[in-house]
Amino acid sequence: MEPLQKPFGTVLENFLNYLLIERNFSPNTRDSYRNDLQRYLQAMQEGCGSLEAINPDSINRFLDELHKTGLEASSIARNVSAIRSLHRFLINDRVLESNPAENLHQPKLPKYLPSVLTLDETMRILQAPAQKVPPEKLYLRDQAILELLYATGMRVSELVNLKQQNLYLQEQFIRVFGKGSKERLVPVGSSAINSLTLYRQKLRIQLAGAQSEDCLFLNARGKKMSRMAVFTIVKEYAMLAGIPKTVSPHTFRHTFATHLLEGGADLRAVQEMLGHSSIVATQIYTHIDRSFVKEVHRSFHPRG
């Protein structure tokens, strides 16, 4: 892909800086916007020649081309959202006087239910690190990661960015910084606390050595772990536990929410623990186990 020329390149960088500084978006979210908008602005640069020449037809032609590449509906929707946000920014920044993306509609997305682990599958994965033969040096760290993912439902990006000072283990809370640096306190149970304590006392000190790295979870070189490293760990122990389904850190997030709701937890409390800004995002977990919902209705409705 050829580099963007002025003013297209300038507009993109200004918008990305706006997302990072004024909207407080995470670097990962900003990079996602960069990838989508780089492709969009490249097409507009080649097809329109100027920002002022962009019109609804040129945007729709671009989206049609995305459809032809076989891009999933969710990815198309993400592109539409990015394009709309960019053009609103250009209006507010007085770069353009009219908004060609004003009437751009999001494509309808197929509803899906997230994959979750049964309680038995969850326990098998959580027990897998200690059952490795021979046991590996890093199993205490891996055990703590798995326990924490299930205990808190936090996102993988939140986990790798945890600092030592974010732990309040005596109070059984962890301070988590989510999307847009939104802060929340998440309860953590005794099993995860025990695993975290063992990791910090017996392994983390060795991994850190003389380095001053403050991130909670470190790799074998004493540096902050990457998101992909956590994905690899989760996948490895799921395979070791004989789980046939695809398991990722986000599977633990889905499982955390589902098991809480199946246990009778309040939907608003689960929303707060997950860090969802809208209750709608949390409600999907009420649809996962239809038999459970029916049982709740039978148990609590006066005429159930």
Predicted segment positions?
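Conserved catalytic core of the tyrosine transesterase superfamily
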Residues: 1-304
